[in-house]
């Protein structure tokens, strides 16, 4: 299995001369996420020393990003590992930011589906605000910058007759596999990397069939050349080839 033998995306950027940072709003759990995250020059799990019941919002990650942006690094690569929309959904956003109501019932029961859906949708709105804030921070630097956002899974919320809930089914459902894949580029980046910008525009409507495209797209966005990069898997390459989705 290649994952045991090859270095991760953070090391690829580090070896290309980038200062690298990994910040997580989840607790370390001896997973590959921890292993690859700790390859960074700087890394931090902001919940690591907090009491188990502590609820830390993803916005705390932005403070760490702000420090990195102001530390004077010429080339910088940051990976943010958010808590996102994990259950319990209502704990993922401030109550005064709820867009959809009612969202007060949180027990994982089919009869509470309306409440659970509203709370889940509120987490998506909160993530939208997080990404907007992150983009604004990058814009203020006037630097050549790009951001890629995706999720490692979607969520079942009693969506069909199977009444599945969460995201750990033996056979993943449509709702677990369809996730966002978003790329933003600053004006300076678009001018400095016109090939990547044109490729992303060209591929924007094409489906992405697997998470391997995250790795190869980031290499392309960073202008990194390596024998491991496969342009056919990078949406930032004009050689990208869309593949059939599972659903």
PLM regions and their residue ranges:
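Catalytic domains that recognize anionic headgroups
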Residues: 1-247
């Amino acid at each position: 299995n290649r994952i045991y033998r090859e270095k991760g995306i953070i090391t690829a950027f580090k070896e290309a001369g980038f200062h690298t940072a990994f910040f997580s709003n989840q607790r370390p759990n001896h997973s590959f996420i921890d292993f690859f995250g700790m390859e960074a020059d700087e890394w931090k799990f902001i919940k690591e020393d907090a009491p188990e019941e502590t609820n830390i919002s993803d916005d705390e990650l932005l403070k760490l990003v702000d420090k990195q942006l102001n530390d004077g690094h010429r080339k910088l690569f940051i990976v943010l590992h958010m808590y996102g929309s994990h259950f319990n959904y209502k704990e993922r956003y401030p109550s005064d930011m709820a867009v959809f109501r009612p969202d007060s019932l949180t027990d994982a029961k089919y009869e509470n589906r309306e409440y659970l859906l509203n709370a889940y949708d509120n987490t998506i709105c909160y993530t939208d605000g997080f990404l907007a804030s992150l983009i604004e921070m990058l814009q203020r630097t006037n630097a050549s910058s790009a951001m890629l956002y995706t999720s490692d899974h979607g969520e079942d919320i009693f969506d069909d007759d199977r009444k599945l809930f969460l995201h750990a089914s033996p056979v993943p459902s449509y709702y677990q596999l369809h996730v966002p894949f978003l790329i933003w580029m600053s004006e300076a980046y678009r001018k400095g990397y016109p090939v990547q910008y044109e490729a992303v525009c060209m591929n924007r409507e094409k489906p992405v069939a697997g998470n391997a495209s995250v790795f190869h797209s980031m290499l392309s966005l960073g202008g990194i050349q390596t024998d491991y990069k496969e342009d056919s898997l990078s949406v930032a390459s004009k050689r990208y080839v869309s593949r059939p989705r599972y659903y």
